[in-house]
Amino acid sequence: MAVALLSIGTELTRGEIINTNEAWLAAELTAAGFTVSESSTVDDDVDRIVAAVRQLASAHRLVIATGGLGPTTDDLTAKAAARAMGTDLVRDESTLLAIRRRVESRGKTMNAGHEKQAEVPAGSEILPNSSGSAPGFGIHLGESTVFFLPGVPREMKSMFAEQVLPRVRPAAPNNTFQVRLRTYGLPESTLGELLKGVEEAHPGITLGYRVHYPEVDLKVHARAATQSMAHDLALKATADVRERLGTAVYGEGGDAFPEMVGRSVRARGWRLAVSESCTGGLISHLLTSYPASDYLVGAAVTYANSAKTRLLGVAEDTLRGHGAVSAEVAAEMAQGVRRLCEVDVAISVTGIAGPTGGTATKPVGLCYWAVSHPGGLVVRDRVFSGDREEVQLGAAYAVLDLLRRIAGNLPER
């Protein structure tokens, strides 16, 4: 079944925020077997919302709209949906009660904005919101079903999974299956070269790539006569892909790179310490963004040379002789924080994140990182391209990947 997506919000049409909802919904629907054939974005204007809803509903059996269900005056989606149906807004008392309980449980007082969120088109199906106050709702326009969800990503995702997907899944084709592989370390062009011939070797397989620096996601999408056959085809093709890409594949589905690194460290029974300079605490943040990160004992952001010397014991002679951005300093940072925290393994990074500070011999983007572990000390370097944030993220991933490979006894690329 072909599906259309409608994103509602002036902040989207003005480019003030990135439309992550559309990308997420498209990926989830594709994985469920649907085909997203059209997507539109419209500002907070009732007439334009009505026109967009009617146009998409006339051409698709299923439409999913996001945004404009909040408490403010520019949240006009419910009003537009009612007009598209040719009906009025009504206050749903059960929804109002749920909103009141949620608001008062947080020690707040109901206001007109909260009450506005309980107004839905007459005859619509209410979709409860377990993550927020604004409910969603579904309507029928001709032969089309249109679901309206809040634009807040966290609320939209939970409502799609809890309310929408169970309702529409029976209409999805049951002859597809998809595997999502997570990769790091190889650019999209290299992945494409390594995977040449996979689709020809496995008829019914389509490969899709999505770059989100510094990772690349690979979708192995299978279509066959039955879902069981598609499942088997996808697994067979995935095995082929994994063999070609080797350790560049770090996980599947919802696996996250920092989390997988942490699992490798925990599997060795190691305790970890981190020392950072140019990344400013980013590595520690990435590692502790996931549960079960108690393998991390401590971290030090030693941005100034004086902090490197005072906290980590980096020798002043090393700093004078080689500079703060050097293999020697990266090594002493890792060894120093390992001693300081009395741990099994320690990592460090130092570099020039830019946009200023580079020289002819040490350009912007140059980073050194080190891992001090029970088997020895390893130091690596690279010049990363991009803006300051990309250099920092690239360096953080590079040292985590080195740690992953050492902990997992994996070869370096």
Swiss-Prot record:
Record's compositionally biased regions (Basic and acidic residues): 107-118
Coiled coil ranges: none
Start and end residues of each stretch annotated as Disordered: 107-129
Protein origin, superkingdom: Bacteria
Family statement: Belongs to the CinA family.
Protein name per Swiss-Prot or TrEMBL: CinA-like protein
